[in-house]
Amino acid sequence: DIVENDEKLKLQSFLKKWLDTKITCELDSLFKLKNINSVNSQIRALSYQLYENNGVVKRDEVLNIVNSLSQDERKTLRNLGVKFGRYHIFLFKLFKPSVVSLRILLWKNFKGEDLNLFPPTFGLNFVNDLKYRNKKFMLLCGFEKFDSFFVRIDILERLFIEIINSNENKSDKIKLLPKMLNLLGCDKESFVKVIKLMGYKVFEEKNETFFKYKPFKKVKKSLDLKIKKDNPFEALK
C-alpha cells in the first residue's frame, strides 16, 4: 500500500518482462519443439510427446515413432536439443539445475498442489529416500524410478555406454566394475538391485560379480495423441 499506484504498475511490468524473458530463455528448446515446422508426421508426433511430457518420455513408450525416424530426421531433432538415449528420449538442456527449478515452480503453480515437493539435492545421481515417492514429479526433476530407487536419466545413459565399453569381447556377461558404482554414486548392494530392475541377471563367478541382459516381457502400450489440457507449459507463449 505504501507504493504509489504508478510505481506499482511499473514494478509489475518489470517483473512480468523479466519472468517472460527468463521462461523464454530457459525453456527455449521446449518452445522450439512446440513450434516445430516439419512436414514429417513422425517428427511432429515425437515433438508433441516431448512437449506434452515436459521434455522427457520413456523410449519404449514411443518406440514405434523412434524406429520410423531416419538418421536425417533424428539429426533434425538432435539439432533442437533432443537426446536419443537407451531408456529415454529427452531434452537434455531442461535438466540443468536452474531450468529444473523453473520448471518445478511452473508445474507447482499450474497444478496448485504438491507444493511441499522439492527436488533432490542438485549433484546427486542416485536417490534412495522414501520421502521421494511421486514418480511423475521425480521424472520432471530428471530421475527415473526403479522400485524405491531413483537414478538420473542422463546417468542411466552414461551407465549404458559404460556397460557397452566394458564388454570389449562381446560376451553375454559383463563384469561389475567399481567405476560403475562411482558413476551412480551408490554401494554394490543398491547397484545390484537397480541393475536387476533394469532387466539384468546378476551372478557370481570366482568371487567376482557379473551381470547379463535378460529383458522382461513387456505389454505394448498404445500412444495417447489427444491434446492434454493439463500441461503446465501449454499456457506459455
Spans of features found by a protein language model:
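Minor-groove-contacting beta-hairpin "wing" of winged helix-turn-helix DNA-binding domains
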Residues: T209-Y213
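Acidic, serine/threonine- and proline-rich low-complexity intrinsically disordered segments
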Residues: D1-L176, L183-K188, K193, K201-V202, ...
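Short linear clamp-binding motif
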Residues: L223-K237
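Short, charged/polar, Gly/Pro-enriched secondary-structure boundary elements
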Residues: F216-S222
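Short, flexible active-site recognition loops that position polar ligands and cofactors
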Residues: L181-G185, L223-K226
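Short, surface-exposed, charge-dense and proline/glycine-enriched linear segments
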Residues: F203-E208, P232-L236
